[in-house]
From Swiss-Prot:
GO term, biological process aspect, one: regulation of DNA-templated transcription
Knockout-associated phenotype: Essential, it cannot be deleted if a copy of relE remains in the cell. Cells missing relBE have a higher steady-state level of translation during amino acid starvation than wild-type cells. They survive antibiotic treatment in log phase better than wild-type cells. Cells missing mazE-mazF survive hydroxyurea treatment better than wild-type; further disruption of relE-relB and tonB yields even better survival.
Protein name, as recorded: Antitoxin RelB
Family: Belongs to the RelB/DinJ antitoxin family.
Taxonomy, superkingdom: Bacteria
Gene responsible for this protein: relB
Note: A number of site directed mutants give rise to a delayed relaxed phenotype; RNA synthesis resumes 10 minutes after amino acid starvation, an unusually slow recovery from periods of starvation, accumulation of a translation inhibitor. There are estimated to be 550-1100 RelB and 50-100 RelE molecules in rapidly growing cells of MG1655; as they have quite high affinity for each other (dissociation constant of 0.33 nM) there is probably less than 1 free RelE molecule per cell. The RelB(2)-RelE complex has a half-life of over 70 minutes.
Domain notes: Dimerizes and binds DNA via its N-terminus (residues 1-50), binds toxin RelE via the C-terminus (residues 47-79). Tetramerization probably requires amino acids between residues 66 and 71.
Impact upon substituting K13A: 83-fold derepression of operon, loss of DNA-binding, still binds RelE
Native organism: Escherichia coli (strain K12)
Length: 79
């Protein structure tokens, strides 16, 4: 059996260990479950979303326009 050693921020460690304890899961069990999921599904068990404020604004504009589409006239020359 192998082992993994990693460095994390002290505050993050304390918060995550406390949350895991509430769930009745050890950090080793949590990491093992995550690695099993990745091995079986070849993807992370959560969505990675790191958006800048500008990107988040753009996403909101796109969502709004999709909710309320308006016709747009475009000529072939403009394409």
């Amino acid at each position: 059996m192998g082992s993994i050693n990693l460095r994390i921020d002290d505050e993050l460690k304390a918060r995550s260990y406390a949350a895991l304890e509430k769930m009745g899961v050890t950090p080793s069990e949590a990491l093992r479950l995550m690695l099993e999921y990745i091995a079986d599904n070849e993807r992370l068990p959560f969505k990675q979303t790191l958006l800048s404020d500008e990107d988040a604004e753009l996403v909101e504009i796109v969502k709004e326009r999709l909710r309320n589409p308006k016709p747009v006239r475009v000529t072939l020359d403009e394409l």
